[in-house]
Regions:
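Short Fe-S-cluster ligation motifs
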Residues: 53-73
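Short pre-active-site segment immediately N-terminal to redox-active cysteine/selenocysteine motifs
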Residues: 22-29
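Canonical radical SAM enzyme core domain
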Residues: 40-53, 72-106, 110
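Classical nucleotidyltransferase
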Residues: 102-154
């Protein structure tokens, strides 16, 4: 599994500080998706040792490990989701698909689904087609992102 890089984000999973991993290989080609900018960026191998070392460095600073993609590498993704849970982190997957395999879903705490459609907007738009779910409770948390939308100028 290859990735573009990792980062710490505050707003991509409600009530969590997340360490993100942007995984190489999405083939959905959603119009205006931020992934388009990443296609020419350098990539790195995300083996289990590097993954474990990286998330352990952030222990106590982040509460969730978030994968932007990776469902196209199900066995590797599942292995990393299990490692994250074993180390006490919650897990999240952002996918452009409408659903993911049950074998992946059972290792997630949160899941964002749906392609990015520019005319509908992303999660911060009330008209979005995307959904953000707490997998454990089944609660749809999408509306929590709407308060993050920039105010419209009059």
């Amino acid at each position: 599994m290859r990735y573009y890089g990792s980062d710490v984000v505050l707003a991509d999973v409600p009530d969590e500080i997340s360490l993100t991993f942007s995984i190489v290989g999405c083939r959905l080609n959603c119009s205006a998706c931020f992934w388009q900018e990443l296609r020419s960026a350098p990539t790195y191998e995300l083996d289990d040792e590097l993954f474990t070392d990286t998330i352990q460095r952030y222990r106590g600073l982040v509460s969730c490990v978030l994968f932007y993609g990776g469902e196209w590498h199900p066995l590797e993704l599942i292995r990393k989701l299990k490692l994250a849970h074993q180390l006490g982190f919650k897990t999240c997957l952002y996918t452009g698909l409408s659903r993911v395999k049950d074998s992946i879903l059972k290792h997630l705490d949160y899941l964002k689904t749906g392609t990015y459609q520019e005319k509908l907007g992303g999660l911060s738009s009330p008209t979005t087609n995307q959904k953000f779910i707490n997998v454990n409770s089944g609660e749809d948390l999408t509306a929590q992102f709407w308060q993050l939308a920039p105010a419209k100028r009059k």
